[in-house]
């Protein structure tokens, strides 16, 4: 017996290997899945007969789910139902259990239920998943009358009438979307359960089976549920997803459903995609994947809506006329006749204008969605060059209402891609990294959504400055159009900001926009990264930085538009990207630039700014009873840079702590004056190792450093400030944890022994799949006798501690650091000098670069 099972197991293995070979040679996937199902039939029937379950009328073996539909994937579960009569003996039940054991022994992943017809029907009446799988059952062996009885007992006359089943499946899909629609699943989508995945196809078949009593979706054409073209589209989507799923199972050697990063690379190679100069093979493959699930989801939405409107609520219509072409039916817009778009193609865009103009419209009727899809061919060259068309499109952004829902629908129905060729190019475009969580088209629409949110009261508390600015914005449509085009040239190679500006220029000309409006839109696209790069990479407390930033703004009003676009862009890139620290940096840059642009700081140089801050801090300290002379003596040792970086309140607090201290080092951990991060302030006798010690301790406490300012005072004391965030990129709220870090820093900085060891931590699973080549560039700052070191590399635990050890070894002095992490990519800026206090020479730069690359490569653990 065991020998027989071993032979069968080997036969299954050989058959699957042959299938994989056929699949690799591009055999039709429908044929592959059906062949596998039929082959498994023979194995199961053989085992069923072997266990003598086929005699008489006591048992019936049924295939369920995808197996019942003859759609078996390489490592899919084999869902079985064994029905038996009420009077079956214990010995016969034991044979049924032995049959299941044999299935497992031969290597079949079997999920099973052994039960009576009445018990199964009772369970189906309470469980949506059970009734759904039963509807796909297929007789394999045994007494067929048992299956017929189950069909009768689970009929819509007895349970789950089609409207009840429809709403239950709709809720099930919404729950699935909520679970699998998160960012992580967008980066590594679930091909089976994710939005637009195979489940979206199966629900269409299930509800049509339940209502129309059909066996195949193609039969729904005769009922008007689906058109021939829509059926062909769904078949295309299904075959694409089946091929990807079969290949995924084959490569994983198990029932893997998630397109994780490592499998994305392997699948792209398997399907023959090749890297190009401007786009990776994996990005091409995932673009095709996202376009398929977008189309699949769009069809799913339209057909479910059609079922709801036509079958469930077909007798409950309230009609309100909008104009000669459109009307509302139960608050859903629809055409008044099916010739509207053919007679006037511009009405396609006009429909979406109505959606923006009338926010009370809940959506578009399914029949009209179908008509839009069938009319896309009308949006040709003549359509796009029409002045009437241009006016309607621009007016979508000029109503003063939120255009997001209308634009989202235009994207889903294919209208945006047909109207703007450049938008079609980025539809489905994904970047292979951890930073960009969405496709370019979806990110673009999220940026527009975020801009609209700035106007809404419920977001005013989260974005108070944005809310204030946008209410005074003269022409919001300029901001929306800047957002629409800001990433339009992604994936082409070259600078997407420059290429996008060219597209924006052509768009504004074609849409007859005023010269000043056109200039601002083009500028926004060209410089949409300016504000975030300045805030995160440069010293925004340096008046020269503000001056250089403002010189790139042609007019003061450009700042308002740029700030709003920057915040919306960051928030729309990745849900985890926006935090209080970025918020505070951008606000400080905005306010500093606003002041400079309005000439309020025209005559204030560094010395004047320092003098003002000193005076404010002095007033605070004197009011607390500290003498003027004591304060002056201490401040006389500080460098002017310190007073530029800190607020008067923080300067006063630091000064009091130093004057009241009885031992060194002085370590203070407190909220940063912007409240966006946590500040670590250290004052102690000069020690070359202090930066290395501090970064090592902070790394061991799992905090991230955002900025560092390192100052050696004239009295040979070190005055350093760090801005840190916790693991969630937020300021510290846990006081005990702050005290623990403070104590650890004090202990190690006071210790004259060895440097603290950096605890080794594994890279996250996601980070292991990316390899950012380490790049190091130097720029000499002759004014300050410093060298700017710009480092790009893979993110990893303890990276800054590794860099600090290299600086220490080579006697490199750090003056300032700006730390920026974008997904797996780190972009850090260090302001350094050699041990004599001057910029690095060529030889020193070469040695430093080689040492950094070596140590960083060794630290990837």
UniProtKB/Swiss-Prot annotation:
EC number: 2.7.7.59, 3.1.4.-
Location of the ACT domain: 679-760, 788-861
Region (Uridylyl-removing): 322-678
Keywords for this protein: Hydrolase, Magnesium, Multifunctional enzyme, Nucleotidyltransferase, Repeat, Transferase
Cofactor(s) of this protein: Mg(2+)
Record region (Uridylyltransferase): 1-321
Recorded GO MF terms: [protein-PII] uridylyltransferase activity; phosphoric diester hydrolase activity
Catalytic activity: [protein-PII]-L-tyrosine + UTP = [protein-PII]-uridylyl-L-tyrosine + diphosphate; [protein-PII]-uridylyl-L-tyrosine + H2O = [protein-PII]-L-tyrosine + UMP + H(+)
GO biological process: regulation of nitrogen utilization
Gene3D superfamilies, per database record: Beta Polymerase, domain 2, Hypothetical protein af1432
HD domain location: 440-562
Pfam families (UniProt xref): DUF294 (PF03445), GlnD_UR_UTase (PF08335), HD (PF01966)
Regulation: Uridylyltransferase (UTase) activity is inhibited by glutamine, while glutamine activates uridylyl-removing (UR) activity.
Coiled-coil parts of chain: none
Comment block on domains: Has four distinct domains: an N-terminal nucleotidyltransferase (NT) domain responsible for UTase activity, a central HD domain that encodes UR activity, and two C-terminal ACT domains that seem to have a role in glutamine sensing.
Function: Modifies, by uridylylation and deuridylylation, the PII regulatory proteins (GlnB and homologs), in response to the nitrogen status of the cell that GlnD senses through the glutamine level. Under low glutamine levels, catalyzes the conversion of the PII proteins and UTP to PII-UMP and PPi, while under higher glutamine levels, GlnD hydrolyzes PII-UMP to PII and UMP (deuridylylation). Thus, controls uridylylation state and activity of the PII proteins, and plays an important role in the regulation of nitrogen assimilation and metabolism.
Family membership: Belongs to the GlnD family.
Protein name (database record): Bifunctional uridylyltransferase/uridylyl-removing enzyme
């Amino acid at each position: 017996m065991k020998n027989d099972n071993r032979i069968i197991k080997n036969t299954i293995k050989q058959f699957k290997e042959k299938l994989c070979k056929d699949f690799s040679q591009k055999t039709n996937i429908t044929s592959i899945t059906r062949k596998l199902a039929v082959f498994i039939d023979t194995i199961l029937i053989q085992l069923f007969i072997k266990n003598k379950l086929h005699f008489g009328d006591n048992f019936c073996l049924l295939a369920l789910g995808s197996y019942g539909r003859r759609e078996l994937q390489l490592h899919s579960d084999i869902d079985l139902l064994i029905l038996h009569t009420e009077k079956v003996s214990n010995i016969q039940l034991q044979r049924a259990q032995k049959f299941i054991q044999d299935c497992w022994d031969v290597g079949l992943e079997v999920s099973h239920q052994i039960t009576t017809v009445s018990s199964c029907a009772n369970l189906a009446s309470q469980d949506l998943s059970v009734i759904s799988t039963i509807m796909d059952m297929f007789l394999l062996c045994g007494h067929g009358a048992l299956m017929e009885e189950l069909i009768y007992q689970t009929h819509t006359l007895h349970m789950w009438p089609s409207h009840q089943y429809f709403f239950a499946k709709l809720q099930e899909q919404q729950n699935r979307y909520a679970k699998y629609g998160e960012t992580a699943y967008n980066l590594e989508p679930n091909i089976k359960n994710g939005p637009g995945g195979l489940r979206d196809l199966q629900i269409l078949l299930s509800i049509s089976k339940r209502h129309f009593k059909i066996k195949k979706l193609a039969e729904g054409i005769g009922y008007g549920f689906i058109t021939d073209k829509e059926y062909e589209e769904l078949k295309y989507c299904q075959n694409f997803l089946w091929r990807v799923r079969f290949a995924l199972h084959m490569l994983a050697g198990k029932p893997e459903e998630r397109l994780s990063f490592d499998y994305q690379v392997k699948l792209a190679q398997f399907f023959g995609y090749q890297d190009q100069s401007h786009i990776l093979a994996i990005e091409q493959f995932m673009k095709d994947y996202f376009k398929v699930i977008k189309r699949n989801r769009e069809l799913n939405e339209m057909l479910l809506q059609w079922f709801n409107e036509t079958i469930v609520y077909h007798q409950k219509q309230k009609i309100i006329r909008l104009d000669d072409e459109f009307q509302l039916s139960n608050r859903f817009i629809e055409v008044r006749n099916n010739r509207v778009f053919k007679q006037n193609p511009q009405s396609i865009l006009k429909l979406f204008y109505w959606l923006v103009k009338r926010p009370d419209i809940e959506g578009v009727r399914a029949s009209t969605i179908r008509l839009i899809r069938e009319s896309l061919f009308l949006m040709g060259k003549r359509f796009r060059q029409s002045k009437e068309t241009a006016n309607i499109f621009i007016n979508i952004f000029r109503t003063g209402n939120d255009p997001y829902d209308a634009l989202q629908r235009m994207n889903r129905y294919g209208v945006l891609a047909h109207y703007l060729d450049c938008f079609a190019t980025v539809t489905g475009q994904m970047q292979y990294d951890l930073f960009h969580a969405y496709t370019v088209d979806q990110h673009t629409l999220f940026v527009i959504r975020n801009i609209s949110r700035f106007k809404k009261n419920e977001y005013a508390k989260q974005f108070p400055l944005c809310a204030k600015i946008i209410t005074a914005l003269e022409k919001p449509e300029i901001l929306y159009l800047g957002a629409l085009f800001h990433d339009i040239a992604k994936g082409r190679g070259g600078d997407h900001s420059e290429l996008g500006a060219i597209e924006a220029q052509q768009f504004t000309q074609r849409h007859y926009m005023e010269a000043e409006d056109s200039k601002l839109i083009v500028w926004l696209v060209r410089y949409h990264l300016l504000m975030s790069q300045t805030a995160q990479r440069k010293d925004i407390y340096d008046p020269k930085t503000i001056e250089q930033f403002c010189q790139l703004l042609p007019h003061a009003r450009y700042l308002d538009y740029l700030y709003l676009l920057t915040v919306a862009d960051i928030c729309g890139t990745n849900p985890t990207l926006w935090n209080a620290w970025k918020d505070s940096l951008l606000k400080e840059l905005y306010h500093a630039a606003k002041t400079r642009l309005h000439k309020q700081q025209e005559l204030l140089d560094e010395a004047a700014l320092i003098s003002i801050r000193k005076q404010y801090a002095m007033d605070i300290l004197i009011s607390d009873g500290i003498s003027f002379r004591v304060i002056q003596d201490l401040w006389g040792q500080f460098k002017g840079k310190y007073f530029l970086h800190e607020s008067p309140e923080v300067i006063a607090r630091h000064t009091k702590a130093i004057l009241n201290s009885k031992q060194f080092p002085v370590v203070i951990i407190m909220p940063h004056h912007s409240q966006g991060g946590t500040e670590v302030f250290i004052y102690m006798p000069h020690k070359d190792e202090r930066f290395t010690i501090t970064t090592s301790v902070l790394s061991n406490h799992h905090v991230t450093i955002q900025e560092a300012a390192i100052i050696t005072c004239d009295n040979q004391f070190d005055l350093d400030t760090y801005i840190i965030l916790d693991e969630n990129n937020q300021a510290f709220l846990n006081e005990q944890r702050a005290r623990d870090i403070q104590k650890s820093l004090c202990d190690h900085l006071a210790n004259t022994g060895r440097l603290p060891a950096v605890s080794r931590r594994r890279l996250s699973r996601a980070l292991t799949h990316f390899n950012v080549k380490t790049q190091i560039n130097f720029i000499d700052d002759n004014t300050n006798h410093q060298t700017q070191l710009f480092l790009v590399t893979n993110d990893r635990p303890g990276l800054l501690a590794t860099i600090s050890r290299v600086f220490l070894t080579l006697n490199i002095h750090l003056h300032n650091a700006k730390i920026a992490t974008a997904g797996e990519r780190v972009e850090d800026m260090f302001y350094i000098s050699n041990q004599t206090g001057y910029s690095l020479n060529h030889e020193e730069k070469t040695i430093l670069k080689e040492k950094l690359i070596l140590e960083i490569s060794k630290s990837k653990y």
